[in-house]
Amino acid sequence: MEISRMTSCSDAEFQQIEALIGVLSTSCKANREIIGEVLSKEDSHLFIAKDIEGRIVGMTTVCCFTIPTGRHATIEDVVVLPECQGTGLGRRLVEEALDYLRSTGKAYKVGLTSKPARVAANALYRKMGFKQKETNVYTLDV
């Protein structure tokens, strides 16, 4: 498996990303324009994992931001195709994102969220050293 930071997205690659987002959530859809924005912004980075045939089988997004307390980042949308789950690919994607943040200095604190139902993912994040916070997460469509 090869993991890299995506800089452009062909139609075929967009369809593969669309399939991955379907694995992550049945209520979310991939948006070609938004993918283009993610790839063009300096504060967002899409990491993809390709198998030996060049098919995208996993991905994660890193979003960087600066607030008065410092440079922070969130890791979002860590997802691997079902047939590739349990192979360590999710860990490798998160490690690649963390290595990027460390090497660029874009963030000194990283957060992520995961649904409680994603038992294996939550166990992975704890094993990697992420600490579960006692907090509520609120969202609002604007």
Language-model segments: which ranges?
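Short amphipathic alpha-helix that is part of the acyltransferase structural core
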Residues: M1-A30
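Active-site rim helix/loop that mediates acceptor-substrate recognition in acyltransferases
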Residues: T26-L46
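Short coil/loop residues immediately preceding or within conserved phosphate-binding loops
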Residues: S44, G70, I75, K133
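Conserved beta-strand in the GNAT
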Residues: I48, R55-C64, T74, V79
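A short acidic/small-residue loop/turn micro-motif
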Residues: C64-F65, L140
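Conserved acetyl-CoA-binding loop-helix of GNAT-fold acetyltransferases
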Residues: V80, G86-D99, A123, K127
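Conserved active-site alpha-helix within GNAT-family acetyltransferase domains
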Residues: R91, S103, P116-E134, L140
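Conserved GNAT acetyl-CoA-binding A-motif
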Residues: R102-S114
